[in-house]
Amino acid sequence: MVLNDDDLYKKHDQLVNLKRQTYEKIFNRCVNTIKLSSDAGELICLFQIPNFLFGTGYPIVNIKYCANYIINKLSEMNENIETTFIDPNILFIDWRKKPNKQPKTTHHFSTNSSEYKSRKSKH
């Protein structure tokens, strides 16, 4: 009996691939939920990560790994999207516009009392 690397890693590689495919399907469902919410005029939504997914070869989903997968992909897609994981399996997704930070104006006085300077600085 020979133990070559291909035989040893074949099943593991198949399971890793099935897991990625399963997480991708769940991610696509999440994106659809965001689009539907956005089309309805909403700026936030909730997405429930399923405990299992029918029709895949990898039915058991590790919720926290799946949540990380979705959060990372959403942040890669759009940096304005903020996602919070809520135990046990909920994602709170927020794409409201964040207020722009205006540079604070600081006032500087020269030694000449009649001269007044105003500068914008970022803090």
UniProtKB/Swiss-Prot annotation:
Location of region: Disordered: 100-123
Superkingdom in the source lineage: Viruses
Pfam families registered for this protein in UniProt: DUF5759
Name of the protein in question: Uncharacterized protein R447
